[in-house]
């Protein structure tokens, strides 16, 4: 008998699904089941149909809290479910029962696959909408779609109807990423290229993980003049490129590499770690007294910073721990001591004319986008090897935490343009899309006619909504790995291969030769 069922992440057991006492991510079976209850309650709320600002907030919070590596705390998950139930009763005199998620997991293979693509896409999109909302940006059309799509998940739908919703999820997510892009750039300025050190300076410091730039800004303000340095971790690295964040002299550098290495890298760390979003792994004894969560992130017995965003406990812990007695050198995954970031759409498009001329003159043969989520699977070395094998006359755009597989490499430059250009966080796929569209316009061709190939890694649900956006835009010949999602049925995969030439990654040498027609 199954104790849980979850197959939403790339590391799901046997690439079929986690169904025992705990998932591969570390969440217990009861936690997984409570998260399903939250989704079931949201589907009931969506079917009630009476949207308010409060229900919008709960939609985003509820979906976000069920993303992989966000919330391991049954108490807070059940509180969210109770809040949803109360609001559902408040907005409608008609009773709308919670949807039983077991019905979705037991559905026919293709219906389950398509509904899962929609649901996991909604989860990823909710994270982006949540961050935008924190900066005062909302889009009524994006908000409405959460209700439409969730309500549909609780109904009988044909595969054709569900496929339309899959692509519509991608369309709405494009608008949502544009919303977050506007929120971030209006608040913090357009990112500029910057070199970020990986050495941790001596003295007190705080490590900030996750994606929430607003939380980072508040922490920078509260630590000003206190003799505490701030270091980004994992997906927070692109913060260094934003003028309104990089202006703080105590935002010093980046700590460590991808999220999946945190249990090793945080071992006995003499400083606190603040998790603003995923990815949080089960916390180990050697640093558990130094971990803090905020926003939707929650873990049993770990102190949580509430909505008032008073980071005093984190600051006090930093002063108590004291940091390293001497400068503490760290390296990237390939031994590098610095990384670069800040090559978002404006920074890259400032050189669009040069890139076009370099392509036309044959100095740039091809452009790759190598990025997405990172993870622990050994097969993810594919992305490092692929980047290393790319010819010297090719450019690499990268983004999200998958960048750590290659971002400390020194691959040189072409005509003064670095061969590795970090566009930002996973939501900055929007920047990469804008760059591709601008280059296509400059060349007078379609995006699929550009010398451009996307080589994507996925792990969790934000990668799903980005993939759906790329499919909505009609992008072809995407390479996806390190495995095909367990929730993509053979028939759905066949459809994606036939209509979009989606290609599972194989080995870097073979794939590179196929892409470059060698």
Question: Which residue stretches match the model-derived regions?
Answer:
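Anaerobic metallocofactor- and corrinoid-dependent redox/one-carbon enzyme cores
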Residues: 2-31, 35-36, 168-518
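Long, compositionally biased, glycine/small-hydrophobic-enriched stretches that function as flexible linkers
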Residues: 2-203, 207, 227, 234-237, ...
